[in-house]
Amino acid sequence: MRKLSTALYAIICTLTINLNSLAMTETDTPNQEDGATLTIFAIYHDDVPAAKKSTIYSDYIEPFTKEFESITGRKIRVIVDQDKPPYSNFDYRKSNTSETILEWLTLSNRYKQERDENNESLYSYNDRVILITNNLLAGSSLLGGTAGIAFAGTPAAIASLGSKRTLGHELGHTFNAIHADGEIKYNGWWCETFMYTPRLPLRADCNVFSQSNRQRIKTYVDSLFDGLNVHEIPEEDITILD
């Protein structure tokens, strides 16, 4: 496997897990040829039970897409896929989670190329591919473990169906959001923004990014369309969290 250059940093997010009922939906409203539109390909792993699929979009995906569109002014198109090996049966529970995301990064690029070859969608490096899994990548829901993983500023991520915030957290990393800019907010009760870590189950999910991360995301996404190379991850966010 080729080693990524030092400009790519592995960010592994370990979140406290309490499993909820989940599910599936699909949106396809923006015009694919609109240059301001990004696509998220959400691939359900084969281990996700059918009973969980009816609410995945509304509970996990939509909170992120609403916030992203508010931040960037750009539309997100969500395409849900499933029952498609070798993508939907990808072996994500490995001893080395960094190797896991490296393999998924390669495989997800192949997935986009395959869709382009089959005239299903045009290939774009900017589009994101996220594998949604039923189980943690490592550890257990009882004792804790790795709930999701993403390379900062790259178009692939994996998120488990534990905390509803995990999917938005990992996608946030792919758009250059960082832990250090995560916040706790208060509006009658305390809540955590998408990037705040470590998670405390007593606090609610804000389903928003902090103002600092909003600016990071906006700048980064604008750079994707302007052809600029904006990628700066502070040292403290390179660390693998246990």
Predicted regions: what is each one?
Residues 1-8:
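Bacterial N-terminal signal peptides that target proteins for export
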Residues 9-18:
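Bacterial N-terminal signal peptides
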Residues 23-121, 225-241:
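Propeptide-to-catalytic entry region of secreted or membrane-anchored zinc metalloproteases
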Residues 28-31, 110-185:
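Active-site-proximal segment of zinc-dependent metalloprotease catalytic domains
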Residues 47-53, 139-141, 203-206:
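Short, solvent-exposed loop/turn elements at domain surfaces
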Residues 51-59, 146-147, 206-209:
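Short, polar loop/linker segments at the starts of domains and inter-domain junctions
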Residues 147-242:
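The catalytic-center signature of Zn2+-dependent metalloproteases
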